[in-house]
């Protein structure tokens, strides 16, 4: 879910930044900050998972993704774009690395290759759908870049709730002995 939500928002970001009155250089700077925020945490995400547990890191990622949406919905100033996209990158990192860790730990070694392939099909199918949906939401949601940007960010909410619910279920279900 974190990968698809990141793609949903990131795809529309340059259009939204320029549509809200900033130049292409500003859009490039926002996306650059976002990409750095996606990958720099990788130096310590594994250590955080080892220390706090994978479920807590995934939950933190979901909360950070929700925070990204909240910041984006709070205004269309350049600072909002920067903060929202930096949070989006960090949330993606925690969610994606955490979920990948969960997947690896949920299967026997002989099952992992097949499960990774199925997971990649689902993940990148979701990313494709999110990317296509992003343009539709951005351009068909009221006629203004501000309305489109709001629609893109509001679209994250149901998926964050579903992912959060699934994570709660995984955390509370009885563990195999």
Specify the residue positions occupied by each region the protein language model found.
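Intracellular juxtamembrane helix-capping segments at the cytosolic ends
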Residues: 94-108
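Structural signature of the two symmetry-related core transmembrane helices
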Residues: 56-71
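Helix-to-loop junctions at the C-terminal end of transmembrane segments
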Residues: 41-54, 138
